[in-house]
A protein has these predicted regions:
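Extracellular loop and loop/strand-boundary signature of outer-membrane beta-barrel proteins
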Residues: 26-29, 99-102, 150-154, 184-189
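C-terminal outer-membrane beta-barrel translocator/porin domains of Gram-negative envelope proteins
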Residues: 4-12, 16-122
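Outer-membrane beta-barrel transmembrane domain signature
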Residues: 67, 117, 130-173
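Short conserved micro-motifs at the rims of enzyme active sites and ligand-binding pockets
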Residues: 30-32, 68-71, 126, 144-148, ...
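Transmembrane beta-strands of outer-membrane beta-barrel pores
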Residues: 21-27, 46, 60-66, 119-121, ...
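Outer-membrane beta-barrel "beta-signal"
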Residues: 193-205
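Transmembrane beta-strands of outer-membrane beta-barrel proteins
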Residues: 15-19, 38, 54-58, 113, ...
Length: 205
């Protein structure tokens, strides 16, 4: 809807499509590299009368040229590089991989998928209506010419990265808890390194 302050969303329809193109030009505004980055995202949601819903997300990223390390794709990691589970306790993201460590993987081509199923709120008390959400995420990626990036350990995602877990939201003042588990080809030898426990925050105004 158009308002004096611009366009505002009053209802959300699906699918939602978005995209982005970035061009790096060597010598322009002090840039040292020529590269191209293209990204696209599709979102869809099934909302049911019982207040449960299922959300689907698929996004793809592609880059070519002399892409610097700082501009490669990271697949939204959200695990601090700490040894203990409680040392990694932090805020869960909406799209991030909670068990993927910062700077663990780099890609110039990346495909990410996510499925979230929201159960109807549990009507325990008038002031306590927690919400359970089941989540599964997957990422595939690759990196050409990894040798360009020197003095850095480069890991890629060509075998597929898998993570599943749950959120129990709105337990107290909008805060909740989440737990995630990493499995598949990039499962780590130490069980605790594959587990992430975070807190969530959802506030409805």
């Amino acid at each position: 809807m158009r308002t004096p302050k611009g366009y505002q969303e009053i209802s959300r329809g699906y699918p939602i499509l978005s995209g982005q193109i970035t061009q790096g030009i060597k010598g322009f505004t002090e840039s040292n590299f020529n590269y191209l980055k293209v990204s696209g995202k599709v979102e869809y949601a099934f909302n049911r009368p019982d207040k449960s819903s299922t959300e689907l997300l698929l996004e793809g990223h592609y880059s070519a040229g002399e892409v610097p390390l700082t501009h490669l794709y990271h697949a939204y990691p959200n695990a601090p590089n700490k040894d203990e589970i409680l040392q990694r306790f932090s805020v869960a993201g909406r799209r991030s991989f909670e068990t993927m460590y910062f700077n663990e993987f780099f890609s110039d081509k990346l495909l990410v998928g996510q499925v979230k199923h929201h159960f109807a709120p549990f009507n325990i008390f008038s002031f306590l209506k927690p919400e359970m959400v089941l989540i599964s995420k997957v990422a595939w990626g690759d990196l050409d010419n990894a040798q360009r990036h020197q003095n850095v350990a480069i890991n890629t995602l060509e075998k597929g990265y898998f993570e599943s877990g749950f959120e129990l939201n709105k337990l107290l003042f909008g805060f909740g808890l989440s737990a995630s588990y990493r499995y598949g080809a990039y499962h780590l030898p130490d069980f605790a390194d594959n587990v992430a426990v975070k807190f969530t925050f959802y506030l409805e105004l």
